[in-house]
Each structure stands twice: as structure tokens, then as C-alpha cells.
């Protein structure tokens, strides 16, 4: 295992906040082909009982990417040329994300292990509002290996998983 196991149990708090933008939500909804009116119109969101445009469910991945990049930029994980593939993710929403929300993030490293020559890291990512209320949690599994191309990873359509080939 090339990845440092002492990151297990580590808590990484993203030092900045993320404000959910109106046009950013609309652009994201268009990009992922979500055409629900609540993603575009304050009036449509109000009809559903919300004070602002609702962000698409996967919108928080933008913020999550900032948090992951910050972590890998600032924490010595033991590999300089690591190739990382996200192999699983699960979201648990506690409340909707709305335009204007000020969000904070924390990433907990739950486990670090090695399988088939690749390092597997499982994280729990928590997103809270400016007043500390839990908005959502994401459980992410990352697989990484040294960037020497000694093995190749590819997506297997039949199994729906990332597999390693020689």
C-alpha cells in the first residue's frame, strides 16, 4: 500500500464556504438535462414551498470537488502522482439546497485499505448551513494508484464497476 494509512480517522474541514448561485444552479440543471421548473424559477420553487430556486440534487458535487482538491493539495497522502477514480457515492439529504445558501464542508476519512493493488479510501462528507444545520451527507469511495500506468482501470458496462486489467 503506497497510500499513508495514518489519514484514516482524519477530519478535514474546508476553510472556506460556498454560496449557492442562481445562475450557477440554472446552468447546472441545463447541463444535466434537468428541466424541472423549480430549478429555474423562483415562482415555481415558491409553489413547492421554497423561498428560492432549488438546486438539482447533484449540484453539491461542485462544492465536493473543491473540498477534495483542497484536501489532496494540502495533505501528504503518500503519493505524488496518484491517479484517482471515484467508484461509488451515496447522498443523504436532510434538507434541500437553495439558491443563496451558504454552505460549509467537512470530510472524514472513514477507511483506507488496499485491494487488487489499488488503494481504497472511503470518506463521509458533511455539508452544513451557515447556522450549523446538517444539509446533506455524502459517502464517497475513491480508488487510487501510483501514476506509473503499470495497471489500467476501465469501466465494465456489464458489472457496472471499475475493473483493473493488466
UniProtKB/Swiss-Prot annotation:
Domain of life: Bacteria
Single GO MF descriptor: (3R)-hydroxyacyl-[acyl-carrier-protein] dehydratase activity
Gene3D superfamilies: Hotdog Thioesterase
BP GO annotations: fatty acid biosynthetic process
Family: Belongs to the UPF0336 family.
NCBIfam families: PRK13691.1
PANTHER family: HYDROXYACYL-THIOESTER DEHYDRATASE TYPE 2, MITOCHONDRIAL, HYDROXYACYL-THIOESTER DEHYDRATASE TYPE 2, MITOCHONDRIAL-RELATED
Protein name: UPF0336 protein ML1908
Native source species: Mycobacterium leprae (strain TN)
